[in-house]
Amino acid sequence: MILRATFENIYSIKDETQISFVAGKSNAHPSHVSRAEKRDDISVLKAGIVYGANASGKSNVIKAIALLQQIANGNFPQSKVEPFKLADTEEKNSKVEIEFKTKGKCFAYGMEFTVGGIKEEWLFEINSRTDKEVFTRKVTDDGNEFTFGKVDGNEETSMLLKFIAHSTPSDSSFLSEYVRRNGKGLETIRMAKNWFADGLKIIFPSTRLQGISFLTENNDELQETTRSLLAYFNTGISDVRLYKIKKEDVNLSSDLLDNILSKAKNGKTYSMAATVGGEMLLFEVNANGGYEIYKQKAVHRNLTSGTEVVFDLSEESDGSIRLLDFIPMLIDLKQNEVDYLIDEIDRSMHPMLSQKILECYFSGLESGRDTQLIFSTHECNLLNLDLIRADEVWFVEKGKDGASHLTSLAEFKPREDVRKGYLLGRYGAIPFFAPISQLKW
């Protein structure tokens, strides 16, 4: 779960800016909060909503978190490192830090970097009162300089740790190198890395999730849950199933095929999903190198005869396909401790669907399970304090300097109709236009 994120000199964010999902003192919607159980614990919100006008920078908040995730996982994408360009800050370091909770522990992981690579990197174990260093890294012309907190193990463990530390290249995170080279002595690093790799899932408008039928195949309970959600969202789709297709009908590159076939190990059948020609396909590989290809299709029911009619997903609307991407997410959130960030949740969908997705998520919350759903949106009907808490809402607005600024709805202490107040511009984060009479065209 994300507690807070801090950004500086990245994308449209100039000065140090913070977004927080630490729960305030409000007693509203108690199920929306993972409450602190011990004195040093931190209470965290299970939902977050980010509003802003077009080009306000709300997507950049999620992009910056995604960038840190990518670097933490071992991939430094130079093309995605973009410092703030509307001031003399392009030569300064960019900074992103995330404080997060996983497996009952809270961490602060962050770094400073330029297009050329990482300049500083750190990981601390934190609670409401203290910070405990795991490691701090500074990259100089002479290489890496490290300090470590308590290291468990013998001298051999310590020597391996130092070797990994000093041989970590500037375009790679120590977090990923420690795990890749099977480091020992600082197991909290592995816990933090696992959260970035498996616990944090980010969805952009162009992201295609693994299809519903790929996840529910051979699982009757999940199939029933999927059919229930399809009916609830009134898609007209009664089911989504896998259908075998001919290999000659798939334009499959040799590199992708080699990658797929290489996954079969230990005499076991292996399945993996891959996007080919814009379509999500499932490849089932046996131990002998043979394989079959499947695609998912939507099943409708003829209302007159009751017979099933099968449609390619290309025949479905963009909104239906977008919704089909979100159903696996809702199932994942209900069953596992995972955190989802979605950019523009309402893209291609009816405004009411965003509300229903949020209501569906809230209905499945359980006090003992730490999950989190954070998304950006324009949908003002969600600004309803009967549905959400004020501290779950953030507004992003650009100032006169072109830089994005973040403000929490809780700072306004709203009591009135929040939706109406937002549309009237009381909280900012909406577009303002000159009178149409001034338009020269």
What are these regions (language model features)?
Residues 1-70, 293, 297-436:
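Switch/communication elements of ASCE P-loop NTPase nucleotide-binding domains
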Residues 33-55, 59-118:
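Conserved P-loop NTP-binding catalytic core
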Residues 78-82, 277-280, 377-379:
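Short Pro/Gly-enriched beta-strand edge/turn motifs at strand-loop
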Residues 208-315, 426, 437-441:
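Extended helical coiled-coil dimerization/tether regions that scaffold
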Residues 108-263:
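Electropositive, glycine-dotted interaction segments
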Residues 1, 91-95, 114-119, 289-295, ...:
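A short, compositionally biased
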Residues 96-101, 123, 298-300:
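Short beta-strand segments that buttress and anchor functional surface loops
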Residues 13-15, 103-107, 117, 129-131, ...:
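Short acidic/polar mixed-charge low-complexity motifs
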